[in-house]
A protein has these predicted regions:
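Predominantly soluble domains enriched in secretory-pathway, periplasmic, or organellar proteins
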Residues: 1-186
Length: 186
């Protein structure tokens, strides 16, 4: 189950699921009606209704096998909803891929992007133009094209699950994103 907590009372308000296994990273849409979760041992994701509490779907990545991973111990540790809420991006650690699905039923698999290393997280620029898997790539989200592989001053790949986007105006921060690939329509 995914437990929804009330932060005023510090109690569990409701449970979503049950899902097929333990819940790993998840993302929600901006209207807080759908949750897309990764679960233990599934190369793919499951969908829950945040209002009714029901599990709605289980979606497997097609054409790829799950296998051993170096980090997180789970084939799909990392999932993001594009800011326009049209796509779900799912990390695949074993195959070093990002799998892209429609965010609407029946959640069709659209394409797969090869990465340079094992992804464990994905987020997007606030405008949705770029995707940032934790493996260090900068991907043009619409074209599904890897534009850059981030490197440090010693030409080592820079990879991280922690990322923040900050917009400045006249030297002052005026807006910021976060490390979570969540819907931003509302």
């Amino acid at each position: 189950f995914l437990h929804v907590a009330n932060t005023k009372t510090h109690t569990v308000d409701r449970k979503i699921g049950p899902f097929s296994a333990g819940v790993r990273p998840f993302t929600i849409d901006s209207s807080e009606t759908r949750v897309f979760v990764t679960v233990n041992e599934l190369l793919g994701f499951e969908v829950g209704d945040l209002k009714s509490g029901e599990k709605l779907a289980s979606v497997k990545v097609l054409g790829w096998d799950k296998g051993p991973v170096r980090r997180h111990g789970n084939p799909s540790h990392g999932i993001g909803l594009t800011p326009d809420e049209k796509e779900i991006w799912v990390c695949d650690g074993h195959n070093m891929r990002m799998h892209i699905f429609s965010a609407q039923p029946p959640y069709l698999q659209q394409t797969t992007i090869p990465l340079s290393d094992m992804p464990g997280w994905v987020t997007f620029s606030m405008d949705g133009q770029y995707a940032y898997p934790s493996s260090g790539e900068v991907i043009h989200a619409r074209r599904r094209e890897v534009l850059y592989l981030l490197k440090d001053e010693h030409h080592n790949t820079v990879s991280s699950e922690k990322m923040v986007e900050i917009f400045k105006k006249e030297g002052k921060a005026v807006a910021n994103g976060d490390q979570f690939g969540v819907g931003r329509l509302h």
